[in-house]
UniProtKB/Swiss-Prot annotation:
The name this protein goes by in its record: Large ribosomal subunit protein bL17
GO CC list: cytosolic large ribosomal subunit
One Pfam family this sequence matches: Ribosomal_L17
Matches recorded under InterPro entries: Ribosomal_bL17 (IPR000456), Ribosomal_bL17_CS (IPR047859), Ribosomal_bL17_sf (IPR036373)
Keywords on record: Ribonucleoprotein, Ribosomal protein
GO biological process: translation
Protein source organism: Wigglesworthia glossinidia brevipalpis
Subunit record text: Part of the 50S ribosomal subunit. Contacts protein L32.
Top-level lineage group: Bacteria
Length: 122
């Protein structure tokens, strides 16, 4: 029985899944919008929104906490100096998922995931 087991497997083993989600976090912070499958976007939102909440307070301990999850100084700098301050007055709901139809090759449902107040368009 799988009672109280949360999260999606996404057709991968745990190390591959963690690595893929970490790379997607880095891409989303760098480009502020990415195109992926709907299930990956929902899983990414669940992981990234708490990191944005932590990044609203710029302290050494918060930087080290996020560095333990992301391991990329350029992305951490952008998260704390650009993205975190944008959401100071907002409590949650930092990301939006926009559905974009089915992928032609395998009919997977696709979506755009982006920051709610980004200036970049689809």
């Amino acid at each position: 029985m799988r009672h109280r087991n949360t999260g999606r497997y996404l057709g991968r083993n745990s190390s591959h899944r963690d690595s893929m989600l970490k790379n997607m976090i880095i891409s989303l912070i760098r480009y502020e919008i990415i195109h992926t499958t709907l299930q990956k976007a929902k899983e990414l939102r669940k992981i990234l929104e708490p990191l944005i909440t932590i990044s609203k307070i710029n302290s050494i301990s918060n930087r080290r906490n996020i560095y333990s999850k992301i391991r990329n100084n350029e992305i951490i700098h952008k998260l704390f100096n650009d993205i975190g301050p944008r959401f100071l007055k907002k409590n949650g709901g930092y990301l939006s998922i926009l559905k974009s139809g089915y992928r032609k090759g395998d009919n997977a449902y696709m979506a755009y995931i982006k920051f709610t107040n980004t200036k970049k368009n689809i």
